[in-house]
């Protein structure tokens, strides 16, 4: 089954609803379980999800080779067949593999990519500088999601840091907020959007 050549639509700040974070099915021998992948996608679509997010932290992307990542994305996109947007985790140990994966999945029909900060970042300025490099790596035409999940990354992104990233990143159209407690952070970000200090984004 071949995935569509272009996404049905690129991700944008109007995205809303349930973007389910999927697992990556494996066989008992540790290989990708593509039959189970198809069943998983069918179940998600039948349940009415607005979109899918694959190869995230819960999707165990770090356990896959580059070849396996491409194969899994191709399988999911082929099964979805443009019915909902699919966001692909593109976090990588370096910018070259991030660029390669992003270019590949966008060509296959992904709606955008998701990026989390690496655990090596220690200061606010390092975090902001890293995402400036993300912007340069992905380019202006690839919509991307900022993943804020300090429990797994070990990187605490404060509200001012996130706002700096958003101000510097016109292609960042969504925040995947997984910090806890996080109500104050979300309230401050929403207030900044309302005041026009940053461009509107979708928050999931």
Feature locations, PLM:
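Catalytic alpha/beta core domains of metabolic enzymes, predominantly
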Residues: 137-142, 149-204
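Active-site beta->alpha loop and helix N-cap motifs at the rims of alpha/beta catalytic domains
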Residues: 2-156
């Amino acid at each position: 089954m071949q995935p569509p050549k272009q996404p049905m639509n690129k991700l944008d700040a109007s995205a809303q609803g349930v973007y389910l974070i999927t697992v990556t099915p494996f066989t008992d021998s540790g290989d990708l379980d593509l039959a189970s992948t198809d069943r998983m996608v069918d179940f998600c679509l039948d349940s009415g999800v607005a979109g899918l997010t694959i190869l995230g932290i819960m999707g165990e992307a770090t356990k896959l080779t580059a070849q396996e990542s491409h194969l899994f994305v191709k399988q999911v996109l082929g099964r979805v067949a443009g019915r909902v947007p699919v966001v692909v985790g593109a976090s990588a140990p370096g910018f070259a593999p991030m660029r390669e994966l992003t270019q590949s999945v966008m060509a296959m029909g992904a709606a955008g990519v998701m990026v989390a900060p690496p655990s090596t970042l220690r200061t606010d300025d390092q975090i902001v500088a890293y995402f400036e490099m993300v912007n340069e790596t992905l380019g202006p035409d690839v919509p991307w999601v900022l993943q804020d999940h300090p429990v797994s990354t070990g990187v605490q992104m404060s509200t001012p840091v996130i706002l700096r990233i958003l101000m510097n990143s016109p292609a960042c159209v969504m925040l995947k907020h997984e910090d806890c407690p996080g109500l104050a952070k979300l309230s401050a970000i929403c207030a900044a959007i309302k005041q026009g200090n940053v461009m509107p984004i979708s928050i999931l």
